[in-house]
Amino acid sequence: MTDNRTSFRLEILNRLCKRERQQRCVKDMFKNYSLLDEQLQQSHRSRSVSVNDEHFKGNVNDRLAVMKEEMANVYRMKSKNDQDLIDANRKLADSESRYSLVSSQRDKLRIETDAIVKKMTVLENELAELKEENSVINTERVSLVATCNYLTEKKTQLDNERFQLLNRIRELQEKSAEFMNAEIALQEERAQMRIREQIAKATADLNLGDERASSAFGTSPETLDEFMMTDVLPSEVKFKLSTHDGEVHDVEWMSDDTFATAGSDSKVQIWRVSPNKTDASKVSTLSGCLGPVNRLDYDSQRHVCLASSNDKTCRLWNIDSQRLLSTFSGHTDKVSSARLFQSHNVISGSADRTIKNWDISSIRCLKSYLVGSTVFDIVAKCGVSQSSFISSHFDKKVRFWDARSSDATYSVELGQKVSSLDISMDGLQVLASSRDDTLSLIDVRNYGIIHLYSAEQYKTSCDSTRAIFSSTGEYVLAGSSNSSVFIWNTKTTKLEKVVKTARSDSAQIMSLAWNPSGRGLLACDRQKTCTLWR
């Protein structure tokens, strides 16, 4: 069927082509005829125009002028339209650019709006959470306010009870002091009775009585070197004395032949050295402390003795009568050191990180100084001002104070915590012992370190080890953990001598005292022993 259609189409196409070839000559003839006819008609029109040209010439000129004017109007309108088109295109371009800018800004604002909406949603959620938390906190606040009011009332009650207890304790302490003084008075009366009995017996022998009288009044001759105005280095041990039932924490010469010791047995013992310097006998015991005694001090007349104790108090005794005069309580931790200050005050430093200034007559605290670090030692009578004192601390600092100010006037930092202080005779230099096994000599006037003293075998015993000046300040000395005493020349820092107080290295030296006469060195240790070197 497909082949028949193809052959039919080819047949038609062939016939058309044949017809085209046959009629091509006739077609050319008709075409030429049409051209000749058009030329003839054009010739006739030319003639008619030339005949009528003169009749219509005027009309044509008028029409031509009108047409020119119309053409000019058209051109003017065209020029105006072109300019309007240019302006319109420019405005369109500006509008499109503004549209594009506005579209971009719109997109940015849309993005920012979406972000703000999201942020608002988050903030609304946070606000709801905060409101809920605030409600909970407010509820807790109301509860805490109620609790605080209750605790405040309870604190007020406890403070009242505390004041009552303090008053009761003070009354009991006063009664205890009265009982102790009564006991001491009784002991004195007994001693006087014994003395009267001895005097009665001594009247039988006049020579023996004369000897005892001369011994009592100290008329026996002394060697010239007792009154030498220079310090003599110790060369031999005169005696070793067991002075306490525990560690001996401090020792002080009260006079050329009398010294006091403080121990862990809560007692202060007064001793007198024999005339031949080979022994010492107990004169009296100052009791009343409820804990180990740490430091001793005395007035210039040697009439009163001040002791600081681990029972958080300081106590003041009359040395002659052994009466307990005052108890200064107010610290919340052990009192490391206390000194008689000015003429009627006591200055004390404690492990509770405070220093207190006490009035002796009223037994009350005049001022508290908040230090912020454990106080190890205090010295007074320093510098040119009577209101100055110096303290040593756990935080490696030596602080200089004026009692009239609440803050330290200056501080000097050393290499380690500062265990003890000692002031020179003129009050212008202070000797500081620190746990880095060195001694530092500090000028009180400009706070500068003048000298450092150290030795290879010297090791600081503990946090309460005491270093001192000799009586004239010619030497500085300190006890070591190996039972030795190291003595340096103050000016040259030369190690002049090392003396050993015990064969065992376990007898750590706690404190030293140089005799006011210049001859005689006392050293106390942790083995209950006090040793005299001369």
Curated annotation (Swiss-Prot):
Family indicated by similarity = Belongs to the WD repeat tipD family.
Presence of the UniProt keyword Transport in the record = no
- SMART domains, from UniProt? WD40
Show the Gene3D superfamilies listed in the entry: YVTN repeat-like/Quinoprotein amine dehydrogenase (2.130.10.10)
Tissue specificity as recorded in UniProt? Expressed in neurons, pharyngeal muscles, body wall muscle cells and intestinal cells.
Query: Which PANTHER family does the annotation name?
Result: AUTOPHAGIC-RELATED PROTEIN 16.2 (PTHR19878:SF14), AUTOPHAGY PROTEIN 16-LIKE (PTHR19878)
Function field: Most likely a component of the atg-5-atg-12-atg-16.1/atg-16.2 complex, which is recruited to the preautophagosomal membrane and associates with lgg-2 to promote autophagosome formation. Plays a role in the recruitment of lipidated lgg-1 probably to the autophagosome membrane to promote autophagosome formation. Furthermore, association with atg-5 is required for the nucleation of lgg-1 positive autophagosomes. Although its role in autophagosome formation may be distinct to the role of atg-16.2, it functions in a partially redundant manner with atg-16.1 to regulate autophagic processes.
Quaternary organization:
Homodimer (via N-terminus). Most likely a component of a complex at least containing atg-5, lgg-3, atg-16.1 and/or atg-16.2. Interacts (via N-terminus) with atg-16.1 (via N-terminus). Interacts (via N-terminus) with atg-5. Interacts (via WD 5-6 repeats) with lgg-2; the interaction is direct.
Q: What is this protein called?
A: Autophagic-related protein 16.2
Localized where?
A: Cytoplasm; Cell membrane
Q: Which CDD domains match?
A: WD40 (cd00200)
Q: Which GO terms describe its cellular component?
A: Atg12-Atg5-Atg16 complex; autophagosome membrane; cytoplasm; phagophore assembly site membrane; plasma membrane
WD repeat copies, ranges: 243-281, 288-329, 330-368, 371-411, 413-452, 459-498, 504-534
- Mind listing the GO molecular function terms for this protein? protein-membrane adaptor activity
One GO term under biological process is: aggrephagy
Which key words are in the record?
Answer: Autophagy, Cell membrane, Cytoplasm, Membrane, Repeat, WD repeat
Q: What is its main location?
A: cytoplasm
